[in-house]
Structure formats: structure tokens, C-alpha cells
């Protein structure tokens, strides 16, 4: 028997990431090749954005995707999020010229408070929320705190792009395919303070750390390359990474819904206190997923260097959280 369609909301739907994302969702890349989807697309309430969204929907229609059971355009989160099973919160206020990080946090806090409240009011009680729009961890924290009637575990932030970037750097360094690499993780914030960690990773079952055996490369090349990759892409292309971000969002949600078969992935999730990360902090952890639930990989040894890096990214997240506290009161 055919499956009932799942409702997927995407915000910032006419933006660059949205444009790279929507066609792949409609094609079945997000939820599987036998799962029909209904797209509920949100854009800001101005004529230019809504017209752009109409154009995107015309293109989606013109693809005649067999799995697409419906698509609608919205300017109000209360209609866009009605009964949704998955919400991809892509739209966020970008940092403008002369804007301090504090201003950026405040501008986004307003957006994600409204969206969190709307999800709380009208989304499915099992909705899975992924925040892509930056600063992703803190935006996800704000949305979660604005939705007290939904389980906190339903809210996640995207660190999969950092995870995939780290994978590709290790594959290039070792000359092995990305599929051979397992047990990699990225700790912390989706920002240059993140900590990509291959101490436990394996290639074809053998230790990556031993295969690379180069601590100087780890500290001076690998960590900064992954941490500053977004900036390097802006420098080269003139615009921020969109297709790779959309791809990471699809990886994140697909693995969350369909399971990882015991493989580790990285998700930004509300901490349960593991590894000394304060409860509710939206933090990148190694996880495995099964039956639509994620579980933090436990029992990993945190050496002195790793602890230092984790403390650094945690400090930044705590400062961001402090910076928006008054807006959540």
C-alpha cells in the first residue's frame, strides 16, 4: 500500500540553499524513494520574495516529480508549519556590513522565537526540526525554548556540513574513498571554534590517526581548513556554500528518519549532560540513529587537547546563549 504523504516545511525557500534543497526533497532524497511528500514553503512577507517563491514553485511543478503530493507558498509560519512532520529552518538574517555578532544574534532571535512558537502551536507533535540558518546552534536553541509543548529532542542544529567537510579532507589526505571512513565526529558549535575529531575514526577498520600519523597536519592544516571552509568558499565563489549545505541538511534528516545502521554521524542536539556539556546546550555530538531517535555515542576518552577544544567551543555557545537570554524571558 502507498505511504501517506509526509509534510515538509522549508523556510527561506526561495533562497540559495532552498533552491538547492527543494528539488532533491521532491525527488525522494530526504525521506526515501517510496515516500510521497507535501512541501510547505515559507518566505518573508514581501512582494519580491513571494514572487521568487512563485517562480521556484513553477519550476518544481515543471519537474513533474512522482513523489510530490503537493506544494504551497506561505508568508505566515502559522500556515506554513501546519501539521508538518519535518521542518527545515533555512531562512535566517545574514550578517550585514558593520553588523556586530550581537546584532546578528538579536535579529535572528526574533525570527526563531516566532517560528518556534508557530511550530509549538500547529506542527505535528513528532515534528523533526533542523536549523540550518546561522548561527545555527543558538537559533535552534531559541526555537526549542520557544516551543515548550514540543519535546526538546525534536530540535537539532546542522553540523553535518562540518562533518562532511572533515570526511572529505581525511579522504583526500589518505587517498581513500569517503565511504571507507567511519567514527568521525565534530564537537560543538557550527562556527570556526568547532572541533573535528578523528581520534576514534577508522579507514577500512584501521585507525585514521595511525594512518595519518601527523599531529602537525591535524592542528595546523586539518582543523583550520575544516573550521574556515565556509569563508574559503565565499572567498572563491563570492557567495556562501549553498549546494553543500543543502546536501548536508538532506544527509542529517535522512539519517535521523531512516537510521544510520550503527554508523556515527554528527548532529547538533540539546545536551543531556554527556561529556560535561551543560544540559540543553545545543551542541555537536557523535550520534547513532535508529527508529527516528538519535543516541549520543558514550564512553569516548577526551584527552587534554580535545578538552581544551571542547571548552573553547562551549564557551562561545555559552556566550551566545547569554546574549539572547533577555529575549527569551
From Swiss-Prot:
What UniProt keywords are attached to this protein's entry?
A: NAD, Oxidoreductase, Tricarboxylic acid cycle
What positions does the entry give for substrate binding?
Answer: 95, 101, 134, 165
- Keyword NAD part of the UniProt annotation: yes
- InterPro entries associated with the record: L-lactate/malate_DH, Lactate/malate_DH_C, Lactate/malate_DH_N, Lactate_DH/Glyco_Ohase_4_C, Malate_DH_type2, NAD(P)-bd_dom_sf
Q: What reaction does this catalyse?
A: (S)-malate + NAD(+) = oxaloacetate + NADH + H(+)
UniProt: NAD(+) binding residues: 12-18, 108, 115, 132-134
- Which interval of the chain is the signal sequence? none
- Active site location: 190
Please provide an example of a Pfam family that matches this protein in its UniProt record.
Answer: Ldh_1_C
Q: Does the keyword Oxidoreductase apply?
A: yes
State the Gene Ontology BP annotations. Answer: malate metabolic process; tricarboxylic acid cycle
> Which molecular function term from Gene Ontology is one that the record holds?
L-malate dehydrogenase (NAD+) activity
According to the UniProt entry, what is the EC number of this protein? 1.1.1.37
Against PANTHER family, the record matches this protein to:
MALATE DEHYDROGENASE
What is the role of this chain? Answer: Catalyzes the reversible oxidation of malate to oxaloacetate.
Name recorded for this polypeptide: Malate dehydrogenase
Q: Which gene encodes it?
A: mdh
Amino acid at each position: 500500500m502507498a505511504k501517506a504523504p509526509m509534510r515538509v516545511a522549508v523556510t527561506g525557500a526561495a533562497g540559495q540553499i532552498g533552491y538547492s534543497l527543494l528539488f532533491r526533497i521532491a525527488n525522494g532524497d530526504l525521506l526515501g524513494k517510496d515516500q510521497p511528500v507535501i512541501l510547505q514553503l515559507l518566505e518573508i512577507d514581501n512582494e519580491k520574495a513571494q514572487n521568487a517563491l512563485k517562480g521556484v514553485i513553477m519550476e518544481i511543478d515543471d519537474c513533474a516529480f512522482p513523489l510530490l503530493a503537493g506544494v504551497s507558498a506561505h508568508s505566515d509560519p502559522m500556515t506554513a508549519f501546519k501539521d508538518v512532520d519535518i521542518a527545515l529552518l533555512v531562512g535566517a538574517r545574514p550578517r550585514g556590513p558593520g553588523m556586530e555578532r550581537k546584532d546578528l544574534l538579536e535579529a535572528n532571535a526574533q525570527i526563531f522565537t516566532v517560528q518556534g512558537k508557530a511550530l509549538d502551536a500547529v506542527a505535528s507533535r513528532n515534528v523533526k526540526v533542523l536549523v540550518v540558518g546561522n548561527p545555527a546552534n543558538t537559533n535552534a536553541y531559541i526555537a526549542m525554548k520557544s516551543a515548550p509543548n514540543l519535546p526538546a529532542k525534536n530540535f537539532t542544529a546542522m553540523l553535518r556540513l562540518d562533518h562532511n567537510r572533515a570526511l572529505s579532507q581525511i579522504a583526500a589526505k589518505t587517498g581513500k574513498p569517503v565511504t571507507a571512513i567511519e567514527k568521525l565526529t565534530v564537537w560543538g558549535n557550527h562556527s570556526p571554534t568547532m572541533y573535528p575529531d578523528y581520534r576514534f575514526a577508522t579507514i577500512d577498520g584501521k585507525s585514521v590517526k595511525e594512518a595519518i600519523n601527523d599531529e602537525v597536519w591535524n592542528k595546523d592544516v586539518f582543523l583550520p581548513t575544516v573550521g574556515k571552509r565556509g569563508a574559503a568558499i565565499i572567498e572563491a565563489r563570492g557567495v556562501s556554500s549553498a549546494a553543500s549545505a543543502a546536501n548536508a541538511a538532506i544527509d542529517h534528516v535522512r539519517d535521523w528518519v531512516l537510521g544510520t545502521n550503527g554508523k556515527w554521524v554528527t548532529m547538533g542536539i540539546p545536551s543531556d549532560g554527556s561529556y560535561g556539556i551543560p544540559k540543553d546546550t545545543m551542541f555537536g555530538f557523535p550520534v547513532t540513529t535508529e527508529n527516528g531517535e538519535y543516541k549520543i555515542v558514550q564512553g569516548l576518552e577526551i584527552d587534554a587537547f580535545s578538552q581544551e577544544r571542547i571548552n573553547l567551543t562551549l564557551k562561545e555557545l555559552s556566550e551566545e546563549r547569554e546574549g539572547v537570554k533577555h529575549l527569551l524571558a
